């Protein structure tokens, strides 16, 4: 136990140091310094660890919340940078591999599709899909549309109009996937009747960074999605919670959904995935203490085999490749 506590303390100190260094940067736009610090952060946060960020003290929790906000800002700037680079090509979709984390999106989208097919079999061939928080590089929607859902129409929602403008340019030369992609500038809180039209709704990890905000978003989706529609929520587990918000499956249950599966990958997929579906009967299982038993038994937890080393090697290779090419990253 002492050894485990020392490991936890050492990791928290390392993350705290990285947070301090990142917070001092004059800008979070892509640069060698930004790249190096965030690569160190991701490398520290992905391999298995005994850290449970939900049990950290108040000071560490405050640091973690600030770090997630910094990660969100840096991720947005990184994606905008690469979206502009890709838009310079005649067919941007032929060059998506330039993005150093593209393989993670491929594997994450594949995992989400496989979980949908297994736990919500009636929804693994949806006609209409919404992706909330698609950003300037809508890799997830693209991979799902091109590789797994060839007949589905995708509505991508983001708060930022500039992000949507960038995203739409990437599909200008593709008459198949491009014809099935629409981009909308909107706050999910303002979507009501539209949500009832979707068979599946994907909720990006950084939509609602604070726990209370995420809970409100999920409750809003639960109030307006159609009965039986599937919800795919990206979350975090363990010390990946330093990078992304952690979503409590109970909050999804309280939002009007039945939680069907929770996946905490320990391979090269960083995000956890929660699969649920809208159920009008879920509140019939509410207990006297207000906790909703939304799972009909134990929730299956899926953990793929670890391939973390492959992800680190791939990202390192991409960094060297673009440094040699004198491309700002």
Curated annotation (Swiss-Prot):
Matches recorded under InterPro entries: Nicotian_synth, SAM-dependent_MTases_sf
Q: Name one Pfam family in it.
A: NAS
> Which stretches are annotated as coiled coil?
none
Q: What class of enzyme is it?
A: transferase
**EC number(s)?**
2.5.1.43
* Reaction catalyzed: 3 S-adenosyl-L-methionine = nicotianamine + 3 S-methyl-5'-thioadenosine + 3 H(+)
Induction per UniProt is: Fivefold increase after iron deficiency.
Query: Which GO molecular-function terms appear in the entry?
Result: nicotianamine synthase activity
Q: Which keywords are on file for this protein?
A: S-adenosyl-L-methionine, Transferase
PROSITE patterns to which the protein is assigned, alphabetical: NAS
The GO annotation for biological process reads: nicotianamine biosynthetic process
Listed under subunit, the entry gives:
Homotrimer.
Its job: Synthesizes nicotianamine, a polyamine that is the first intermediate in the synthesis of the phytosiderophores of the mugineic acid type found in gramineae which serve as a sensor for the physiological iron status within the plant, and/or might be involved in the transport of iron.
Family per similarity comment: Belongs to the nicotianamine synthase (NAS)-like family.
The identity of this protein, by name, is Nicotianamine synthase 8
Q: What gene does this protein come from?
A: NAS8
């Amino acid at each position: 136990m002492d050894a485990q506590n020392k490991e936890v303390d050492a990791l928290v100190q390392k993350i705290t140091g990285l947070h301090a260094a990142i917070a001092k940067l004059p800008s979070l736009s892509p640069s060698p310094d930004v790249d190096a610090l965030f690569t160190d952060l991701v490398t520290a946060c992905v391999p298995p660890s005994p850290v449970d960020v939900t049990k950290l003290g108040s000071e560490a929790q405050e640091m973690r919340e600030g770090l997630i906000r910094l990660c969100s800002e840096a991720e947005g700037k990184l994606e905008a940078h690469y979206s502009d680079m890709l838009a310079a090509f005649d067919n941007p979709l032929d060059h998506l591999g330039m993005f150093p984390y593209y393989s993670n999106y491929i594997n994450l989208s594949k995992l989400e599709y496989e979980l949908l097919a297994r736990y919500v079999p009636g929804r693994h061939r949806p006609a209409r899909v919404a992706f909330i928080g698609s950003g300037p590089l809508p890799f997830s929607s693209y991979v799902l549309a091109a590789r797994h859902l060839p007949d589905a129409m995708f509505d991508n929602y983001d708060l930022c109009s500039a992000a949507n403008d960038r995203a739409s340019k990437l599909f200008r030369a593709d008459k198949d996937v491009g014809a099935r992609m629409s981009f909308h500038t909107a706050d999910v809180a303002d979507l009501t009747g539209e949500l009832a039209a979707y068979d599946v709704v994907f909720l990006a990890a950084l939509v609602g960074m604070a726990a209370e905000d995420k809970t409100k978003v999920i409750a809003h989706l639960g109030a307006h999605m159609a009965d039986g529609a599937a919800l795919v929520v990206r979350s975090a587990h363990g010390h990946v919670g330093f990078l992304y918000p952690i979503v409590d499956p109970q909050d999804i249950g309280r939002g009007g959904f039945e939680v069907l599966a929770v996946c905490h990958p320990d391979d090269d997929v960083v995000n956890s995935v929660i699969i649920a579906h809208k159920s009008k009967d879920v509140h019939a299982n509410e207990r006297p203490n207000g906790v909703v038993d939304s799972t009909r038994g134990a929730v299956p937890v899926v953990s793929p085999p670890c391939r973390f080393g492959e992800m680190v090697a791939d990202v390192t290779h991409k960094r060297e490749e673009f440094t040699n090419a004198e491309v700002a990253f």
